[in-house]
UniProtKB/Swiss-Prot annotation:
Belongs to the complex I NdhL subunit family. It comes from the Bacteria. One of its GO terms (molecular function) is quinone binding. This is NAD(P)H-quinone oxidoreductase subunit L. It is found in: Cellular thylakoid membrane. Pfam families: NdhL. The lineage of its organism: Bacteria, Bacillati, Cyanobacteriota, Cyanophyceae, Nostocales. Its EC number is 7.1.1.-. NDH-1 shuttles electrons from an unknown electron donor, via FMN and iron-sulfur (Fe-S) centers, to quinones in the respiratory and/or the photosynthetic chain. The immediate electron acceptor for the enzyme in this species is believed to be plastoquinone. Couples the redox reaction to proton translocation, and thus conserves the redox energy in a proton gradient. Cyanobacterial NDH-1 also plays a role in inorganic carbon-concentration.
Amino acid sequence: MIVPLLYLALAGAYLLVVPVALMFYLKQRWYVVSSVERTFMYFLVFLFFPGLLVLSPFVNLRPRPRKIEV
């Protein structure tokens, strides 16, 4: 009984928890990273790609509209 729960917890972490944290990390650091950190970010995206793909329909990464004052 413990083995299926362990598999479920690991699958949930791999497909949901870590990709959500990774998306927040990428959104905060994308424009201010060094080249070494960017390589690490690419590695994390490659490693957690299935989870990012699962979450992609629910994420809006488009820039916010600008406020133009007249």
